Regions:
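Alpha/beta-hydrolase fold catalytic core
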Residues: 1-23, 45-48, 83, 110, ...
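Flexible "cap/lid" loop of the alpha/beta hydrolase fold
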Residues: 103, 110-141
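Conserved loop-alpha-helix segment in the C-terminal half of the alpha/beta-hydrolase fold
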Residues: 203-236, 242
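Gly/Ala-rich beta-loop-alpha elbow adjacent to hydrolase catalytic centers
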Residues: 90-94, 98
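Conserved HGGG/HGGXW glycine-rich cap/lid loop of the alpha/beta-hydrolase fold
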Residues: 12-61
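Active-site loop/oxyanion-hole signature of alpha/beta-hydrolase fold enzymes
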Residues: 38-41, 50-89, 250
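Conserved alpha/beta-hydrolase catalytic His-Asp/Glu region
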Residues: 123-127, 142-198
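Active-site signature of alpha/beta-hydrolase-fold catalytic machinery across serine-
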Residues: 38, 100-104
Length: 259
């Protein structure tokens, strides 16, 4: 296993390995940089790979506010000090932060890879509203351990994903505080950068898995105004990089090599 260097900067915990062009990895809600280990292992042979714990996650600062622009501004402060621009890979919440980052600091973002991301979080349909409300209900009524059980079943279904599901549940309970997680969750509705996507000149690879929460047609609609985008539709669920690290790494390598 390739050794990671763990450090703190501007209140953020960073896990890094390798030398070369900068590849920045941003995790999803309730996750941490630990979930990018397979990508750190694979890409640190040719890249300087940095996985960040976003505010409110992992070993990073736990104080609010927790809105997406603030999470992105945290990362921007660190990225602005780096000598080179980065390819930024974001999963779910991390994809939202990646978009904000590219808008806040465009000269330091070379390209984006958005895995099951959103350009807005408006909860427009009954299904979207129900899903968001259900997560808050599980959190309020039952607490973090039962929520981890429910999320594990949703993210990693089936007997073949039992080991991944088990690891997810353990990490979720260990690294998340109920009050902070709830504040992060409640900060999401109403966020949107959809009207500003036309200003992003960088290449953007959109990965939308076959069994994600958001239907492909709606994701295409959300990102239609991007001037330089490609879309990829592999088989998988919402947290695909953890579900199928080899498959994700193969696609990410192909995207990076293309540009």
């Amino acid at each position: 296993m390739r050794r990671n260097q763990v450090m703190k900067s501007h209140g953020l915990a960073l896990r890094s390995a390798g030398e070369g062009p900068l590849l920045l990895l941003l995790h999803g809600l309730g996750s941490s940089s630990l979930d990018w280990q397979a990508q750190i292992e694979r890409f640190s042979e040719r890249y300087r790979v940095v996985a960040i714990d976003l505010r409110g996650h992992g070993q990073s600062m736990q104080e609010g506010p927790f809105d997406v622009p603030t999470l992105a501004a945290d990362v921007a402060r660190w990225l602005d000090e780096q000598p080179e621009p980065a390819w930024v890979v974001g999963l779910s919440l991390g994809a939202m932060v990646a978009l904000e980052l590219a808008l806040q600091l465009p000269h330091k973002v070379q390209g984006l890879v958005l895995v099951n991301g959103f350009s807005e979080f408006l909860l427009e349909t009954p299904r979207e509203q129900e899903r968001h409300a259900m997560r808050l209900k599980w959190l309020r009524w039952f607490g973090m351990r039962p929520l981890a059980w429910w999320l594990g079943r949703e993210l990693f279904p089936g007997p073949e994903l039992a080991p991944v599901r088990h690891t997810f549940r353990l990490r979720f309970v260990r690294s998340n505080k109920k009050k902070t997680y709830r504040a992060l969750l409640e900060a999401l509705p109403g966020w949107s950068v959809r009207a500003r996507l036309g200003s992003l000149w960088q290449p953007v690879a959109i990965i939308s898995t076959s069994h994600d929460y958001l239907p492909l047609a709606k994701r295409v609609e959300q990102f239609a105004s991007l001037p330089n985008a490609s879309i990829h539709t592999p088989e998988g669920h919402h947290a695909w990089p953890a579900e199928d690290p080899a498959g994700f790494n193969h696609l990410l390598h192909r995207i990076l090599e293309t540009h």
